[in-house]
Amino acid sequence: MYNCAIILAAGKGKRMKSSMPKVVHKVCGKEMINHVIDNVRKANIKDVNLVIGKGSETVKEHTKDRNVTYSMQEEQLGTGHAVICAEEFLKDKKGTVAIFTGDAPLITNETIQELFEFHNSGKYAATLISSTVQDPTGYGRIIREASGVVKKIVEHKDCNEEELKVNEINSGMYCFDIEVLLNSLENLNNDNSQGEYYLTDVIEIIKKSGEKVGAIVVPYEEIMGVNSRVQLSEAEIVMRKRINHKHMVNGVTFIDCESTYIDVDVEIGNDTIIYPGCVIQGNTTIKEECTLYSNSRICNSVIGSGVIVENSVILESHVGEGTTVGPFAYIRPETKIGKSARIGDFVEIKKSTIGDNTKVSHLTYIGDAEVGSKCNFGCGTVVVNYDGQKKQKTIIGNNAFIGCNTNLISPVKVNDNTYIAAGSTITKEVPEGSLAIARSKQINKEGWLDKKGLLKK
């Protein structure tokens, strides 16, 4: 059986009060439209078409790696009109098409699979997703026949007294037999107060033709649409609970899961402990037995097993197993730190490689450098990598000891097994086995304070 999907993503999203299309706003690190696309794909649906309109180029930019096709809806004349705009996508296809909304990011791949299976096994012409809620005010009601088969969808404003008591609501997401849908769209009109073409009217057209219409009922959170910043926040809360629950089931300890913020594509190994206030973003991978103390942020990075991070920021970097980072360290993009290293407090590292067992314990800046293994950096060391026009490279070999308050003026090379005396400013290569001293000779002027009248008696 051929299955495909159309995702409606042309809405303006006026209530978002944003210059961006509504569907590219993110929930737990991923655009709403990409949540829907990815879950459709997890349900083994290969052909996906997006109906786009306002901000179409922005939507295309955010979905360019998703291997989807696009249909344009120049004017927003209702959900039925949006599907009419995708008729070219459906042309000459036979099978089943599902229609989803790009602003409902909480729909799961399990529900999508269930929708297709229910629709195809029951040989329905149309199947819709519904939900039951305590307060259905404002929603279209699902009216069923005594047998349980869907009879019609009635908008709230058109409900009679009995229909208002129904608490099963329409989600705006459907499955259709493609041929039946295309035939029904030919009979769709905009004879209503809004002058729009409603997809809900297609259900009534199908019923009148004698075809079967079914429905599956899912939890409300799965069909919740996002039309405002308030609803965006509500969706974020639901998604975050799902993400954290998944990690806890897989063996991750959260000291306080409600104050831990993890993006949807993050991977975390078992026996890792995460303290409150941590933010883990993007395509980050954290391996087994790590400890992330409070107020740490890690984005698009790989953290090896047994790493300890405390009150630190790690961006687009790799940290080797057994390394400790922080407190208050700043690991900037394109940094690779080896195994069992020590990156201490108020250390900033940018676009550099740090070898195994190297210690950079405090108050140090390293930029555009290659540092070997078993090195030790004293407090206050600075790699001076910028000459006013471009960044220069520093190379430090294995077993180098860098004394406190050393300036390494790039480009410069410090070879294996070297010592640099505290307070030195190094501008030339330091040979292997050498001690480098580059500082002014100390001069003591005896009696100077007395001569200047500054000596307190």
From Swiss-Prot:
One BP term from GO: peptidoglycan biosynthetic process
Binding-site list for UDP-N-acetyl-alpha-D-glucosamine: 8-11, 22, 73, 78-79, 140, 155, 170, 227, 332, 350, 365, 376
Database matches in Pfam families: Hexapep, NTP_transferase
Positions of the UniProt region annotated as Pyrophosphorylase: 1-229
Binding residues annotated for Mg(2+), in chain numbering: 103, 227
Catalytic residues, chain numbering: 362
EC code(s) of this entry: 2.7.7.23, 2.3.1.157
GO molecular function: glucosamine-1-phosphate N-acetyltransferase activity; magnesium ion binding; UDP-N-acetylglucosamine diphosphorylase activity
Enzyme class, spelled out: transferase
Binding positions (acetyl-CoA): 385-386, 422, 439
Cofactor: Mg(2+)
Subcellular location(s) per record: Cytoplasm
Annotated SUPFAM superfamilies: Nucleotide-diphospho-sugar transferases (SSF53448), Trimeric LpxA-like enzymes (SSF51161)
Complex and partners: Homotrimer.
Family, similarity comment: In the N-terminal section; belongs to the N-acetylglucosamine-1-phosphate uridyltransferase family.
Biological function: Catalyzes the last two sequential reactions in the de novo biosynthetic pathway for UDP-N-acetylglucosamine (UDP-GlcNAc). The C-terminal domain catalyzes the transfer of acetyl group from acetyl coenzyme A to glucosamine-1-phosphate (GlcN-1-P) to produce N-acetylglucosamine-1-phosphate (GlcNAc-1-P), which is converted into UDP-GlcNAc by the transfer of uridine 5-monophosphate (from uridine 5-triphosphate), a reaction catalyzed by the N-terminal domain.
The protein's name in its UniProt record: Bifunctional protein GlmU
Gene designation per UniProt: glmU
